[in-house]
């Protein structure tokens, strides 16, 4: 039997698409953490079938826009004294900056490295973003491109 204790203070990143948990874990640099962290993969879920969960025994700064871009179904639970203080449901952010790079070699961001890569959401249903400078379309949510 698998037992993972509750955390006293920290955050739980829940409802991660199965298989994406390890990539989010690495993106957040949690393999270097000096506090307790649990990555649960392929947990049963009534909504998703299977899901990943990350439990972090520490309050840390996380860019919710990036997590929403990776997977808008993620829920963040902020835990204090072993109870959920706040539940944050993520969604696709309207804009993202320096999360992905424009793939257009003629884009100003490819030529001038000091210009931030900025994208804005153009199709929420398909998760498509458009480069602010050259209008190149990027389909969001592909964690492999981070």
Swiss-Prot record:
Short name of one Pfam family: PyrI_C
Entry GO CC: aspartate carbamoyltransferase complex
Keywords annotated in UniProt: Metal-binding, Pyrimidine biosynthesis, Zinc
Gene3D superfamilies referenced in this protein's UniProt entry, alphabetically: Aspartate carbamoyltransferase regulatory subunit, C-terminal domain, Aspartate carbamoyltransferase regulatory subunit, N-terminal domain
Cofactor binding remark: Binds 1 zinc ion per subunit.
Cofactor entry: Zn(2+)
Domain of life where this protein originates: Bacteria
Binding site for Zn(2+): 102, 107, 131, 134
Cross-referenced SUPFAM superfamilies: Aspartate carbamoyltransferase, Regulatory-chain, C-terminal domain, Aspartate carbamoyltransferase, Regulatory-chain, N-terminal domain
MF terms in GO: metal ion binding
Entries under InterPro entries matching the protein: Asp_carbamoyltransf_reg_N, Asp_carbamoylTrfase_reg, Asp_carbamoyltrfase_reg_C, Asp_carbatrfase_reg_C_sf, Asp_carbatrfase_reg_N_sf
Gene Ontology terms describing biological process: 'de novo' pyrimidine nucleobase biosynthetic process; pyrimidine nucleotide biosynthetic process
Protein function: Involved in allosteric regulation of aspartate carbamoyltransferase.
HAMAP family: Asp_carb_tr_reg (MF_00002)
Complex formation: Contains catalytic and regulatory chains.
Family, per entry: Belongs to the PyrI family.
Protein name: Aspartate carbamoyltransferase regulatory chain
Gene name tied to this protein: pyrI
